[in-house]
Amino acid sequence: MKIVAFTLVAFVALAGASCPYAAPAAAYPAPVAPSGYPAPPCPTNYLFSCQPNLAPAPCAQEAPAYGSAGAYTEQVPHYVGNPSREQVQQFHQRIGMAALMEELRGLGQGIQGQQY
């Protein structure tokens, strides 16, 4: 087996040494000009156009000085704190009952599917 591998390696080395190295040809020619799509003309009959209108609206009020609340008109959300021990026990009971009901439902379907 070693002789076969050695012969194969020697043949590949001999074949590689006898062939002059040539750089691979390019797969495709480089594009002459960058490809792309031209920009569409600016619309003139739409509510919003390409040109920005930076003048303020005549009925606009002055911007208020933003404090710590920023521009929000809603109340800052309050997150629920840690649940009490009773709430945790109720949660665990509900999860346990749901798991038990799912198990019983699966057993009921298994019994109905059996052939007697």
UniProtKB/Swiss-Prot annotation:
Entry function: Major early eggshell protein.
GO biological process: vitelline membrane formation involved in chorion-containing eggshell formation
Location (main, coarse): secreted
Family statement drawn from the similarity comment of this UniProt entry: Belongs to the vitelline membrane family.
Keyword terms: Secreted, Signal
GO MF term set: structural constituent of vitelline membrane
Compartmental location: Secreted
Domain VM: 36-73
Record-level GO cellular component terms: extracellular space
Pfam families per the UniProt record, alphabetical: Vitelline_membr (PF10542)
Signal peptide residue numbers: 1-17
Protein name stated in the entry: Vitelline membrane protein Vm32E
